[in-house]
Design a protein with these regions (language model features):
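Charged docking surfaces used in two-component/phosphorelay signaling
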Residues: 16-24
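Short hydrophobic/Thr-rich beta-strand motif most characteristic of the beta2 strand and flanking loop
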Residues: 26-33, 41
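As written
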Residues: 61, 70, 84, 92-103
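The feature encodes the CheY-like receiver
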Residues: 15, 57, 87
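Acidic catalytic/metal-coordinating carboxylates
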Residues: 34, 60-66
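Conserved sequence signature across two-component system core domains
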Residues: 8-9, 32, 50
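C-terminal output helix
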Residues: 107-116, 124
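Active-site residues of response regulator receiver
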Residues: 53, 83
């Protein structure tokens, strides 16, 4: 089974880079460019994993996460948050949930792979 991953970032270059990399790893990729699209696509497609920028137009990734947690169909989707800001700066808005991780931009593909491999099983994904 191929993992379906939803990327949400308002920077189209970052989205394109992540999409290309994840497709090279045989994942199916969806993209969103703001918080509203993230919420809509997550509810519609129910991906195995969400990779979300913290600050996006429409709604912060962390705010959308809170909305997704209230929906029985999306509450178990693991989320990898990414941001140019440090974890220390964001610790008050990042959820304290074992199904989430955080990477500071620029992210390395090794760190990305590690987080994906940790998070996918937490949402029930079975390869």
């Amino acid at each position: 089974m191929i993992a379906q991953i939803l990327i949400a970032d308002d920077n189209v270059d970052i989205t394109a880079l992540l999409e290309e990399y994840l497709k090279s790893k045989n994942h199916r990729v969806l993209a969103a460019h703001d918080g509203f699209q993230l919420a809509q696509k997550a509810a519609e497609h129910r991906p195995h994993l969400i990779i979300a920028d913290i600050q996006m137009p429409g709604a912060y990734g962390s705010s959308v996460y809170q909305v997704l947690q209230k929906d029985p169909y999306t509450k178990n989707i693991p989320v990898l948050f990414i941001s140019a800001y440090s974890h220390e700066k964001l610790k008050n808005i990042l959820p304290n949930d074992p199904k989430t991780r955080f990477l500071q931009k620029p992210i390395s593909f090794a760190d990305l792979d590690r987080c994906i491999n940790e998070l996918l099983p937490l949402g029930g994904y079975v390869p």
